[in-house]
Design a protein with these regions (language model features):
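Bacterial N-terminal signal peptides that target proteins for export
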Residues: 1-8
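Enrichment for repetitive, rod-forming helical segments
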Residues: 9-10, 33
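C-terminal motif of bacterial Sec signal peptides marking the signal peptidase cleavage site
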Residues: 13-17
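Bacterial signal peptide processing site
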Residues: 18-23
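Alpha-helical segments in soluble extracytoplasmic regions
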Residues: 28-107, 123-127, 131-138
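Short helix-adjacent coil turns
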Residues: 109, 113-120
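Short, solvent-exposed mixed-charge patches
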Residues: 113, 142-143
């Protein structure tokens, strides 16, 4: 996990040295979104496997806790960006909202699993799917 964070930060630092301000922000958005999308998908998979009785509650809870930390790291990394044009400001607001939505869904799952409430965790599956889809679109920005 720390290695992935270090790689992500190094990538952002390297990308910050080249390109226009809008391109730099798109690259940072894409990197953060890809990282968060992975964690959201991990959370979704944990809930689905728990529902199918292929995973223990305790293991699922730990997986989701780790995923929540990953989403928080991605969101924090992106929120440190400084948009400098109207275009980059709009992108910043959109990406920040999408990351916040993902973080909210993953946190809701963690809380539900901590309360041994699989039904409440399952209610987050549509939000997790939508977040993964939205983050995937953002993740394609720098490609």
């Amino acid at each position: 996990m720390r290695r992935a964070v270090a790689i992500m930060l190094l990538t952002i630092l390297i990308l910050s040295g080249c390109g226009s301000p809008d391109q730099k922000l798109r690259s940072a958005a894409a990197q953060s979104a890809r990282s968060a999308a992975s964690e959201v998908s991990t959370t979704r998979l944990a809930v689905e496997q728990l529902r199918a009785q292929r995973l223990w509650t305790r293991s699922a809870g730990q997986i989701v806790k780790d995923a929540e930390k990953g989403v928080e790291t991605a969101a924090s990394s992106f929120s440190a960006q400084q948009p400098s044009t109207p275009t980059s400001t709009r992108l910043y607001e959109q990406v920040t909202k999408t990351l916040d939505d993902a973080q909210t869904a993953v946190t809701a799952v963690r809380i539900a699993l901590g309360n041994d409430d699989l039904a409440a965790a399952e209610q987050q599956l549509p939000a997790l799917r939508q977040s993964a889809k939205d983050l995937g679109r953002i993740g394609e920005l720098a490609q």
